[in-house]
Regions:
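Mature soluble binding/inhibitory domains
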Residues: 1-299
C-alpha cells in the first residue's frame, strides 16, 4: 500500500494498504479526506473535512523536504500534538528552498500531497494522495497524443523513515519529510516510457542563526531513482522503481512501485501528470510519496 504505519516505541514502520481519497470541494481550502484502514485498524477509518479554519502552516508542517505548500489539521492543535488528522496540498507551492533544477509548477488541474492520522502518542499513520484539483467536473484523465515524446517536470513530496527491521542498519531513527525533482518522459500515445527522481532532500528544521530563519534541507544518501513502467489501464500507468546509478543507497525494485495518471480539460488534454509511489532502500528506509508535474513544451 501507499501508506506507512509507524510505532513510537520501536521507531519502526511498515507499509500499509490504506485506501485514501481526497475530494476538493471548493476553489481553495476545501477538502474532505476519506480513509479506509485494514480490518484490524478499522476504528481509524472515516472522513475528515478541512477548510481555511484548519490551516496549519506554522512550525514547518507545510514544508516537506524543501518544498513549501499548504497544510491543514483537524482539530487544529498547538504544536501538532495528537490526536489529529492532517493534510498537505502542493498544487500551488510557494517555492523550493534549495537549488531547484526548475520552478515548482503551479498546477491547474490536479492536487497532490500527504495525509497523516495521529490517534495518540503510541502510533501514527502517513500516506499520500493525488486527485483532481480544479474544483470542477470538467477535468478528464485522457491520454495526450503527439508526434513526438513529451516531457513533464515537477516535484515529489512524501514521508520516509526506518523500516520494520530498523536498528543500526537504518539511516534515520524517525519519520521525516522529503521532496525531490521528478522528470517523466511520455511517448506519442500518451504512455509513460521513463522517469527519474533526482536528489531527495529531507526537512531538518530551521537555521535560526540567520534572519529570517532559513529551512535546512540536507540531501538523503540515496541514489537517484528511475521509473520503470510495466503496465497500464485505460487511464493509469504503473511500474516499479529502481536505482539510476551514482552514489548512495539503492532502491529495492521488488517492493517499490508507482502509478501515474494524466489530468487536463478539453483543449488542454494531458497537460499535467500526477501519481504516487513507494520504495524501500538498502539503508533501512521505507518511503511513500506523491508527485505533480506539468508538460514542458520543447524549446
Amino acid at each position: 500500500g501507499y501508506a506507512i504505519g509507524a510505532c513510537a516505541s520501536t521507531k519502526t514502520g511498515v507499509f500499509l494498504d490504506v485506501a485514501g481519497s481526497v475530494a476538493i470541494t471548493g476553489a481553495r481550502d476545501s477538502y474532505i479526506l476519506t480513509l479506509l484502514f485494514p480490518t484490524a485498524l478499522q476504528a481509524y477509518s472515516g472522513s475528515t473535512p478541512f477548510t481555511s479554519a484548519n490551516l496549519a502552516n506554522g512550525y514547518g508542517r507545510n514544508v516537506l523536504g524543501a518544498l513549501q505548500g499548504d497544510a491543514y489539521e483537524n482539530p487544529l492543535t498547538p504544536g501538532g500534538l495528537p490526536p489529529y488528522t492532517a493534510l498537505t496540498d502542493f498544487h500551488n507551492p510557494c517555492c523550493y528552498h534549495a537549488n531547484a533544477p526548475w520552478p515548482a509548477p503551479q498546477l491547474q488541474y490536479v492536487g497532490y500531497g500527504t495525509w497523516e492520522k495521529a490517534p495518540g502518542g503510541a502510533e501514527g499513520f502517513v500516506g499520500v494522495w493525488y486527485g483532481s484539483g480544479a474544483g470542477t467536473t470538467t477535468v478528464v484523465n485522457a491520454r495526450p497524443t503527439s508526434a513526438m515524446n513529451r516531457v513533464y517536470r515537477g516535484y515529489v513530496v512524501g514521508m520516509i523513515g526506518p523500516d520494520e527491521d530498523a536498528g543500526a542498519a537504518s539511516y534515520l531513527d524517525s519519520m521525516r519529510s522529503f521532496s525531490a525533482p521528478i522528470e517523466i518522459v511520455v511517448d506519442g500515445t500518451g504512455h509513460v516510457v521513463s522517469g527519474t527522481i533526482d536528489t531527495l532532500l529531507m526537512f531538518d528544521g530551521y537555521d535560526t542563526s540567520v534572519s529570517p530563519p532559513t529551512i535546512k534541507a540536507p540531501a538523503l544518501p540515496i541514489a537517484p531513482v528511475n521509473l520503470a513502467p510495466t503496465g497500464s489501464t485505460i487511464d493509469t500507468d504503473s511500474g516499479s522503481l529502481g536505482s539510476a546509478g551514482g552514489t548512495g543507497a539503492t532502491v529495492d525494485s521488488a517492493s517499490s512501485g508507482f502509478e501515474a495518471k494524466f489530468f487536463g480539460v478539453s483543449g488542454d488534454i494531458g497537460f499535467e501528470l500526477a501519481g504516487r509511489l513507494r520504495f524501500r532502500t538498502s539503508n533501512g528506509l521505507i518511503a511513500v510519496g506523491s508527485f505533480g508535474s506539468q508538460f514542458v513544451p520543447a524549446p
